């Protein structure tokens, strides 16, 4: 009997091998971006203080225009798309049209509405607390945590539904890191978890959520300790975790950032977002973005550490 991963890989490669080869050429030979983030919608029902709220509101492209945009990116050799917002599930029909055009996809969602199985797509669910009280407080929406549990349980009960939890630690919730890992590693609703720390954003009104240097150092220490307890569920290598330390981030700048260099970001009107997904309003010297720790963790380390980080990145993607 064939391994299930092998049976998934064969049709995936038959469908996508030309664009995968073109993407490798873009990155390795031409030094061009090979992935992009796209704001599927410019709307969100959640009341948190995320980077999106500090950006200008725009007129969304039509479904047909977005599909055309993604098809063009595929022809150019882009191999990964991050489907974000706002809240991407504000436009569920559009998600169904664009997911799978690009070989690898993340849908980053707050889980406010029922979730759909999408081809070649991992759902990245935003969870900022181990309890409804904490999560709903951070997210500014009462009852949201209970809705996430309901929607994830329903989606997972229908069969294969690749899911990664994403937690952004801030001054209000960082002390609950261990509880979040304990809860989500045992409830059967996710395949892993990724951790970011809050990146300060101008005009986001996030002052009460910003981490002190001491808190950021403590988070790195806690993550290194917890990695031994959750070696598979915590989708971060030691190299990635150490990239969150203030001694490392204080040297970051857009010209040296692999996220800014290799991953383009677009708003819901199809216009480039300056710098990166967080925009040029982000304070790079306190960057805690998981995408940056992933890309940064593949360089400047031993061969073993680089391969481990690459394998961790692949765990967050799906061929199915």
Residue ranges and their predicted role:
Residues 1, 121, 126, 133, ...:
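Radical SAM enzyme [4Fe-4S]-AdoMet core and its adjacent flexible, acidic
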Residues 2-117, 313-317:
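Conserved alpha-helical substructure of the radical SAM core
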Residues 37, 41-44, 250, 277-280:
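Residue-level signal for mature regions of secreted extracellular proteins and peptides
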Residues 46, 132-133, 282:
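Glycine-centered loop/turn positions within well-structured domains
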Residues 75, 117, 186-187, 281:
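Alpha-helix termination/capping residues and helix-transition junctions
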Residues 86, 128, 198, 292:
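Flexible loop residues that form catalytic
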Residues 252-320:
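Flexible mid-to-C-terminal extensions adjoining Fe-S/redox cofactors in radical SAM and related proteins
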């Amino acid at each position: 009997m064939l391994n299930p991963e092998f049976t998934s890989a064969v049709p995936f490669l038959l469908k996508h091998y030309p664009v995968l080869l073109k993407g490798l050429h873009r990155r390795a030979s031409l030094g061009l971006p090979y992935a992009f983030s796209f704001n599927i919608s410019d709307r969100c029902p959640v009341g948190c203080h995320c980077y999106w709220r500090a950006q200008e509101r725009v007129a969304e492209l039509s479904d047909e225009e977005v599909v055309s945009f993604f098809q063009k990116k595929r022809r150019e050799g882009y191999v990964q798309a991050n489907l974000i917002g706002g809240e991407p599930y504000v436009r569920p029909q559009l998600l169904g049209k664009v997911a799978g055009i690009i070989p690898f996809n993340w849908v980053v969602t707050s889980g406010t509405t029922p979730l759909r199985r999408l081809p070649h797509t991992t759902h990245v669910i935003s969870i900022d607390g181990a309890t409804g009280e904490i999560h709903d407080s951070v997210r500014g929406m009462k009852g949201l945590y209970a809705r996430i549990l309901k929607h994830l349980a329903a989606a997972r009960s229908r069969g294969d539904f690749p899911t990664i939890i994403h937690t952004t630690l801030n001054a209000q919730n960082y002390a609950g890191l261990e509880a979040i890992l304990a809860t989500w590693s045992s409830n059967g609703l996710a395949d892993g978890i990724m951790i970011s720390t809050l990146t300060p954003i101008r005009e986001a009104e996030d002052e009460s959520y910003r981490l002190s240097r001491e808190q950021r150092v403590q988070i790195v220490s806690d993550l290194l300790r917890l990695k031994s307890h959750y070696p598979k569920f915590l989708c971060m290598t030691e190299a990635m975790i150490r990239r969150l330390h203030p001694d490392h981030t204080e040297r970051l700048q857009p010209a040296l950032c692999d996220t800014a260099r290799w991953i383009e970001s677009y708003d819901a009107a199809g216009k480039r977002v300056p710098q990166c997904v967080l925009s040029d309003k982000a304070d790079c010297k306190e960057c805690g973005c998981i995408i940056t720790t992933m890309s940064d963790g593949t360089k400047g380390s031993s061969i073993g550490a680089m391969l481990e980080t690459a394998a961790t990145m692949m765990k967050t993607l799906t061929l199915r």
